[in-house]
Amino acid sequence: MKRVPASDFPALRQFFGGYLHEDFVEEYGTPAVALKTFEADADEDERRRFHAEVKRFLEVTAPLDFADVLRLLSRLGSRWTPPTREALIAALTGAADR
């Protein structure tokens, strides 16, 4: 497996470190609420970069084993461990609320 550099995803690193950190459950309760809060806090350019990176992240990680994806999430600063790839996709795309 080719290692995906966390540095390729600065907007995701900012989101994970700022919203899905070790205290996110106490602060937000769920990844969906953390995402909504980020989107409310971010300006239009930050939201655009985030959504572009989410799309690229999901494309790049699609062929990877989920364990490798979880390691990448940790390197990006996430302290949330999604139970499945589908849960990760739903959380990052806001589909968890739909």
Put a short name on every predicted segment:
Residues 1-36, 93-96:
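Short terminal alpha-helical segments
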Residues 1-4, 9, 48, 56, ...:
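Non-catalytic all-alpha helical scaffold/repeat segments
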Residues 8-13, 31, 47-51, 85, ...:
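Short runs of predominantly hydrophobic/aromatic residues within well-ordered alpha helices
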Residues 15, 34, 53, 69-72, ...:
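Charge-rich, solvent-exposed alpha-helical interaction surfaces
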Residues 22-60:
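Amphipathic alpha-helical interaction modules
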Residues 46, 65-69:
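Positions within the helices of HEAT/ARM-like alpha-solenoid repeats
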Residues 59-66, 97:
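Charged/polar positions within long, soluble alpha-helices
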Residues 68-98:
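Amphipathic alpha-helical binding modules
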